[in-house]
Amino acid sequence: MTVGVLDAFLVTWSRARAAFGDGAPQDGSAYDQSPALLELQAEVAGGGPGQHWRGPGSDAYGQANDKQTAVLGEAARLDAQLRAEVDKSAEVVAAGRRELDGVRQWMLDAASEVPRTAEGERMLYPVVSRGSGEIVEILERAVADMHSISTRIGGIGAEYHALSGDLELGTGDGGGQAQIPLPSADKPMNTRG
């Protein structure tokens, strides 16, 4: 094989390949708790006031229970979306690696066909130029794909944040905190059963 232009290409290729890291790309399974959230959603939905509890307390509890059920369902949906986006990012990495490996192999095959002379070196210039262009295209495509994924993950994060604002622990005046009734002069507590 010729030395020089091919070596320069391989250095460029190695740097591009390093951008995709080593090892198996992590999929999104670690971020997806949707099965557990959906199970919890079903349990919470089953804990509503039902037909045997009536009145204002029942209505308030039922509304809070419905809201909690909806929040759990939304959290499950967001978890599944996050997993899908992380899976997509892993595929971008895997595809980039495959494509770069293909370009490298194509380059090595082409280099093996030219004579090991100055003329052979000159014959490699357009081949190296094309291979380098393909490396640039692979990197640009991966960056664009990762940017799109990042934007969507940011949107999912914003939805998670908005979802946390939908949770309340109680309906008292304590900013959503449960209130414990205290006796006062105008409202003594009834201690007799």
Regions found by a protein language model. Name each.
Residues 21, 27, 95, 184-191:
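Short, solvent-exposed coil/turn linker segments
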Residues 24, 34-35, 48, 180-187:
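Intrinsic-disorder/low-complexity coil detector
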